[in-house]
Amino acid sequence: MHIFKNLTEPTAVTHSLSCNFTGERNLVLVKGSQLLQIFRYKDDIPTKDEAPRLELITEYYLDGTVTGVTRIKTIDNYDLDSLYISVKHAKAVIVAWNASSFTIDTKSLHYYEKGLVESNFFEPECSSVAVSDEANSFYTCLLFQNDRMAFLPIIEKGLDDDEMPESGQVFDPSFIVKASRLDKRIENVMDICFLHEYRETTMGILFQPKRAWVGMKNILKDTVSYAIVSVDVHQKNSTVIGTLNGLPVDAQKVIPLPAPLGGSLIICANTILYIDSSASYTGVMVNNTHRQNSDLIVSRDQSTLDLRLEGAEVCFIQELGNTALLVTEDGQFFSLLFNKDGRRVASLELRPIEPDNFILSQPSSVAAGPDGTIFLGSRAGDSLLVKWYHGEPESQPEETLDDGNESDDDLYGGDTAQTEDTTNRPLKLRLADRMLGMGPMQSLALGKNRGSQGVEFVTTTGVGANSALAILTSALMPYKRKSLYKDMPGGQFWSVPVRFEEEGEVAKSRTYVVSSDSENSYLYYVDAAGVIEDVSLSTKKKKTKKHFVSNVTTIFSSSMLDSALLQVCLETVNIYDAKIGQPHKYSLPQGTTAVEARVLGNYVLVLLSDGQVKILEAVSINKRPFLKAAQVSIEPASESKAIGIYATDSSLTFGAPSKKRTRQGSPAQDSRPVVVVCYADGSLLLQGLNSDDRLILDASDLSGFIKEKDGQLYDAPLELVDIALSPLGDDHILRDYLVLLTPQQLVVYEPYHYNDKLRFRKIFLERTPTINSDRRLTQVPLINGKHTLGVTGETAYILVKTLHTSPRLIEFGETKGAVAFTSWDGKFAYLTQAGEVAECRFDPSFSLETNWPVKHVQLCGETISKVTYHETMDVYVIATHKTVPHVVRDEDDEVIESLTPDIMPATTYQGAIRIVNPYSWTVIDSYEFEMPAEAALCCESVKLSISDRKSQKREVVAVGTSILRGEDLAARGALYLFDVIEIVPEKERPETNRRLKKLVQDRVRGAFTAVCEVSGRLLAVQGQKLLVQALQDDLTLVPVAFLDMQTYVAVAKSLNSMLLLGDATRSVQFVGFSMDPYQMIPFARDLQRVLVTTCDFAIEGENLTFVVADLQKRLHILEYDPDDPQSYSGARLLRRSVFYSGKVIDSSAMVPINEDRFMVIGVCSDGSVTDVVPCPEDAYRRLYAIQTQITDKEAHVCGLHPRAYRYDPILPGTGNSPHRPILDGHTLIRFANLPRNKQNVYANRLGQRYQQLIWKDLELISDLFKKCI
């Protein structure tokens, strides 16, 4: 019984599309093939280069694996683009923007899997590909199973703009066509596209009639063909316009080019080909491997570039008309010029581009935006928004690497004025915006959190020069924390800055601190050194007297008139001058008490116990402050009593949005005083304090969006703890959000306008605060330049929004909790539950663009493949490798002279081990492996016993390597043991006080693929043999036990004397280790063919289960139960559950939740962090019932059903049927985001007494790390 949840969302971009989706130019992104995000290009943000940036509009987590995104236009909404999204296993969905609800609507769903029973339909290489006719927007095509095409005809727009079919349909029925029906030669389709320059719908189809690969070049060569086919979808017939045969077998994809250039590009591994409308071609060779692998003759030879085009992306620059941007997998940039001879493209030419101070690795997609911008998505690092521009003209044009007399094409081509003007002006790229990317995460280590007593999570990210360590913390940790006062009484406190003038002196400022408990109030002040002192003690020393009223409870305090201190008590409102002289007291109406108070300018708004709002005005008479009844008032918006009030200066407009602009062109932010009042029946009043602007909204149900009150409200009373209209964001993008805090949850609404009326839509929160009626909402000072909102409590939170994210809750990492937040002199301060006042800062190097704060540290410019934590010396040890040319060697490591020395060599890896200091995050020592092409496959810090006679343990770093010599030679490797020793640091570098010392080097046949510690001994997997070795006094390793393994052990995990071994092809094996006598005891194994990527133990009390992740993106829960008949007396592991996670989990670690519960946290290739949590039986039953109701009753994004996504019965090798499914944390957290009536309906089906228990059960999902920070 387990729960699966994403702790952080995917960050690796897999698809991108620039379109007009919401009525403005948008960028649509898919991250990790699951997270759909809609951005707008913001050109009104003042930046250094006046380049646009990206702002997130909305995002959705999809219950499906996206394989393609393209845009179409439909007759019912022709001014906007709709999205055609293809999903794994031949599914497609069409969505459009709904401006009234500020969300997406599913317009059409298409499933094409019925009747397709071929086994390869579900293979990964047969995933579906979506394309659309962007030139005419009349058709879409979904390619799946390599040779089946599903066409969806879109009804064309007639001459009358208002012409719509009587049925209201916008699509004709879709149908499936086998590729061979278009032309009998077409099979094994590799890629398709719709071509642009044709009057009728025309497709370009890249296919391979005879399957082959480069290794078959002596038998089959150039087996790929390209066909241009005119398709009449309505008549269901086709005509082949032209065919081009004999293309290289390494052709990858076809890219259509817009008019007036037209035609298409075919990207091969070694060449780029341009195909015109008559199926004629021209091309450019980018390396000298092309001549070996293909007989195709190309017009231009630029083989000295030595490019590899596998994974390259191309973006055509429409503004230039004859230039495209080429980005290679290793991050090189080139401009691809189409040199014309008249209207014919005569040749292609590549010119290198030097980027301006940015790096890109493994591009996944490109999208051309407005104003010369191009978005570059990446799977292995940050995704970038760049802007192209022309540099200064070159004084002497570079010589092109032509083959023969191809320069004639350049002399007579390019007759347009623009081409002539820009030919000798190099294309350059400037960074406009950067989006955080953390994929792929390959290794995970748990280290000491230097900001608290908990742990920090360190993982490897990126590839090559973009590789880095990512330091993640489950909470926003205080940085440079300073304690200011101990044992401050009361559970509330406020800082009150005031100004006062002494006779003949310049005005001074002082900050008072007011705290209160249930009986008394206390006054302090902050001295010049930042120390808090009790006013009563300081006045005794100076023999002065303060008149602060202390024998009452204070519910609110603030500064007023810039020089007065306000104290709102239960029955009176007191105001003091800056020296705390005799106060002026204003008594509240008899029989009422103050419940809540706010200050807005010179006004004090007090919410009384009878539900009325009393407004007072502060005035100064003879330099003394006084309070009087204000002339303004608030007319009640409901017959029920007011239960919450908030007042602030806001730029929200209740009617049509303001069209005012600043001189820079950005929208003018004219703020005005606004009061928000919430009533018990759910009515919500927004009123301008000094104007007639007034808006009454219906928030009774806390539904997905709230609008003007126009009918009956939800009948259940609304329980409200606090309310705020708070600005979130930074100085560039700052927007007021409506925040409601109830006893169970936090609800955040974002404002938007529809039909010139203000509405609010609910923001989906991935976590909800724990149940606590003592929580409060507090405006906190800027955190690293961002406006945030604090949520106090035993576990406090910060509500944060960045330019690229929606508002999200991030836990505040104070272990003592925070019952109040405040600030003085721009410093962040808070009061803990223990009565300690502390101030702190926050590390600016941590990014807040994920659910967990993350810090990226680039170290050595090499790929970091492994990381481990050395606890004794408090350092991290990493394994890195770099790409080097492959040198062919024989069995004796002698170099074999190449028969083709002029051909671009293959590449291999050369590895190293390095120490990273966790305080400076720099590399302080390295060990380069001696053998050529030797790289680490595993690296672990282990504590080994020294001989059997001593109880002493020594922590060392065990490294297993492989010498990458090629598949024709037997594998070789080495086992290293390194000690981390303390040395005298270098001068002016105190962090260099650690060094690696090699203890053991054992070079043998076979690669060392996994190492770990078991009962103080070292376990190492060498080839297909597992060895357990003991460390002796002379620091040598002696084998004490062994076990034969199956194929390739990819991971080994230990728990005391128990071992879990994961095989790359044969699932897992559960093994025990005994020391008296030494022996390996095989307990049980899984007999299914599971391609294991990582595995670990999951513990709940006395229950032990195994969590296994595989390459097919599944999670398996296995159990060892010898008493179960299906286990064959314990010989087989029982499969208790199978769950499709939708991501490849590359590494995992067991993390304690409390003393008897451990969860498994994993890092994924898409840049996300996940966890699997054991769940108690009673909580599991309740949550399973809630999940079932949400799955069955609620509408799902894009119509994709969670149950069909998570459980796929077609996947082979699942073994005996699971009887306890893993709970989906994302589906469960939707309960906290449902309207109140649905929450009550679903909870009441379990029984009324379970309602509160369900909220506590959700803490299993949202607050797992309170003990870890």
Swiss-Prot record:
Coiled coil feature spans: none
Family of the protein in this entry: Belongs to the CFT1 family.
Protein name (Swiss-Prot/TrEMBL): Protein CFT1
Keywords: mRNA processing, Nucleus, RNA-binding
GO function terms (MF aspect): RNA binding
Spans annotated as Disordered: 393-427
BP term (GO), one: mRNA processing
PANTHER family xref list: DNA REPAIR/RNA PROCESSING CPSF FAMILY
GN (gene name): CFT1
